[in-house]
Amino acid sequence: MSGGVGVGKRLCCIALVMRAFWYLSAKGVSIAYVPVHRSGGSQDSSMSTAVGDTLLNAFFDEGMVVTAVPPGVHDGQTIAEIAACFEVMPDYALLVQFHSARLPGGESPTSRARGAWSSERFRAVWTLVDLHTQRACVYACVAPYRESIPVSECVDVVTRCIAEQAISYIRVGTSTDTAGVQL
């Protein structure tokens, strides 16, 4: 019985991810799959994989992560549009990963991100570091609209980080699924 529940949960998660893909595609966001090292770093990718069987492979393979890559990543309006789509999809969160390797105090970015995604009740992680004084690894979860963090604030910070070329990639996942959001 538990096996059936597990399969049903995964199918439900896949359906939710595909719904996110459809919504993002409608807003002009290209979908890609980026191989990710267990250390959290991203490998190079052509960013041109078609949505299809690869979606399922990416969803179940620990070495892959479903990633949304906006066209013209240096355009703040593009980021605003992505944030806006999450306002009407409250079960999703946008996770932005930055280049550097460590959080302040030596905490590994992997443990911080996994802790945020694996909590039973999803809580927004909003770690702001002044990029002018500290080049630390910062994870900024753009929380569902029902959370207390204003989307406008998220957009402002993400836009600033884009201007500083601090963003490495943007990934999409649900607030309850951890299998689809691997580091």
UniProtKB/Swiss-Prot annotation:
It comes from the Bacteria. This is Uncharacterized protein TP_0432. It comes from Treponema pallidum (strain Nichols).
